[in-house]
Amino acid sequence: MSEIDVVAPNLKRRLSGVTATVVRLIPVQARMIGIVTTGPGLPADLPHIPLRRAATLPRDRWRVWHARRNTEMALGLILRRILRRKYKLLFTSAAQRQHTGFTRWLIRQQDALIATSPQAASYLERPATVILHGVDLTVFHPAADRAALRATLGFAPEDIVIGCFGRVRAQKGVDLLVQAALRLFPSRPRARLILSGRITADNQAFADDLQRQIDAAGL
């Protein structure tokens, strides 16, 4: 393993958007800088060190602790202030919402901030560098036979298909998209909407209510 300059923690076992970002981004970054992950639930082919090693790296120089969650920001503070590790603290935020008081306090302790959109940056209350999410075109690209793919999904070639991908929860505004479809689709018979994403237990009632609205409209 090359010299470690950046440690990117992932302190959540369950797959989430943050975890997916780490999994996709680290291999790209590892071709340019000395970066490793730490924490559970990550693929074995990622450059990785145990948490105990992240907490005992030598103090010979500064390294970057790149957090994406509150728990990871908090651990970075512990490593630097209590264990006296030489970490510069970096936080990347994709959230487009008001942060809690605790999160705002954690953000104030960071040395630098990244936001994945101008909208996310507007909620940070501190200057942030905006770096938009990229797309790996070797993985995500149009199908070779789009008509066959549409048929597999039950869509006709002339259908106008709108896709929404990601966890189904109120915070993401999925309900606004459904409400717009309920108003517009009756007069646009070729329009189709597909939602694809995980529904966690705490959002099941929200998803069920959306399904009831769709069923009631006969769509």
Each model region followed by its residue ranges:
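Short His-centered aromatic/hydrophobic patch
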Residues: 67-72
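A short helix/loop element that forms part of the nucleotide-sugar donor recognition site in Leloir-type
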Residues: 142-155, 210
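Conserved donor-binding/catalytic core segment of Leloir-type glycosyltransferases
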Residues: 151, 155-172, 178-183, 194
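A conserved, positively charged/aromatic
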Residues: 86-111
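Nucleotide-activated donor-binding/catalytic signature segment of Leloir-type glycosyltransferases, i.e.
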Residues: 207-219
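Short donor-sugar binding/catalytic loops of nucleotide-sugar-dependent glycosyltransferases
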Residues: 10-13, 165-169, 199-202
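A short, active-site helix/loop in glycosyltransferases that binds the activated sugar's phosphate group
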Residues: 108-142
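N-terminal subdomain of nucleotide-sugar transferases
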Residues: 1-44, 55-60
